[in-house]
């Protein structure tokens, strides 16, 4: 069997819990605590202030704060680094369905007129369930007269999908969220702090995927934090190593994905690539390899790539 598993589709609540259990096994944790403010001493960050689930105010002191608190990061807001501008943000809506026909072990990305520019995803989630949703730029969403929910309904009721959703039922209310894209190199560190994941705006502009870059950020942040603990240096200069390591690894791909996002806005170019892929297995493998990170995405923005497609 030459089929190789490139990844897994797993609900966030399950995967997040898996990660939390791993963390809880090696450190002290506190659940139900909401950070409200940063604590400063001598103009430097010295901890956080917040509330427990019982409503009790508490302060935790630390020589460094690592903000992994998502797209609506309180840490980034309090530092004045929160960015959710129209140009560098996408919006998405997701819903789990049961009874969707034609599911396989393959993820599906559909570039359809109802979501142009943007795409509709359909991911198998096991036990006859599917994770479906749409994503598009905040700029494009603002120009829409339709809500994201209306667009999603239009897609599943369209001629192309209506048979697959004939007996399908939503398992929840659709959930929407903002996606801070890694189209620009945002400030992610300073004296006594580092920002990771969505809090640092690391989402891939082309695919909308963020967990991979967030985990890369976690790897380098822990490396630098460990070094700082040994040296006692928690300065912006010391933490600049985190930024350098992170962007040396993901910067080129994020820049390429930004170019690809712009290219995908061209219906002519998108249809050209997809039509060639439909007729040519080699082109299919090239595109699949790029989506699964087996082939560098920068090849997709190279003129040589289109030469290959044209003559494959």
Regions found by a protein language model. Give the residues of each.
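Short glycine-enriched, charge-decorated loop/helix-capping segments at active-site entrances
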Residues: 3-7, 81-83, 138, 210-212
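Predominantly flavin-linked oxidoreductase catalytic cores and closely associated redox partners
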Residues: 17, 21-167, 180, 185
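FAD/FMN-dependent oxidoreductases across multiple families
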Residues: 37, 140-224, 228-230
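C-terminal helical "tail/cap" subdomain of flavin- and related membrane-associated enzymes
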Residues: 226-312
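Generic secondary-structure signature for well-ordered alpha-helical cores
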Residues: 24-28, 80, 84, 98, ...
């Amino acid at each position: 069997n030459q089929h190789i598993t490139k990844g897994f589709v797993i609900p966030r609540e399950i995967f997040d819990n898996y990660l939390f259990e791993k963390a809880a096994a090696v450190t002290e944790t506190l659940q139900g605590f909401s950070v409200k403010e940063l604590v400063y001493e001598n103009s430097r960050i010295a901890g956080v202030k917040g509330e427990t689930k019982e409503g009790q105010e508490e302060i935790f002191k630390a020589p460094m704060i690592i903000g992994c608190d998502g797209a609506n990061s309180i840490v980034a807001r309090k530092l004045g680094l929160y960015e959710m501008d129209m140009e560098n943000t996408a919006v998405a809506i997701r819903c789990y369905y049961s009874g969707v026909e034609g599911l396989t072990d393959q993820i599906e990305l559909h570039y359809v007129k109802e979501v142009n520019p943007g795409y509709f995803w359909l991911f198998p989630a096991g036990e006859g369930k599917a994770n479906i949703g749409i994503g598009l730029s905040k700029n494009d969403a603002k120009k829409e007269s339709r809500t994201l929910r209306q667009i999603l309904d239009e897609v599943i009721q369209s001629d192309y999908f209506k048979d697959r959703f004939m007996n399908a039922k939503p398992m929840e209310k659709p959930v929407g969220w903002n996606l801070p894209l890694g189209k620009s190199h945002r400030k992610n560190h300073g004296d006594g702090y580092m920002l990771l994941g969505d809090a640092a705006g690391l989402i891939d502009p082309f695919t909308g995927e963020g967990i991979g870059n967030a985990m890369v950020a976690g790897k380098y942040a822990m490396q630098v934090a460990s070094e700082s603990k040994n040296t006692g240096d928690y300065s912006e200069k010391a933490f600049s190593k985190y930024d350098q390591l992170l962007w040396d690894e993901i910067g080129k791909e994020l820049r390429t994905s930004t170019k690809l996002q712009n290219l995908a806005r061209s219906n002519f170019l998108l249809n050209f690539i997809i039509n060639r892929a439909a007729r040519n297995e080699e082109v299919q493998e090239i595109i699949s390899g790029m989506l699964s990170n087996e082939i560098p995405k920068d090849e997709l923005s190279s003129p040589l790539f289109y030469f290959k497609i044209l003559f494959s």
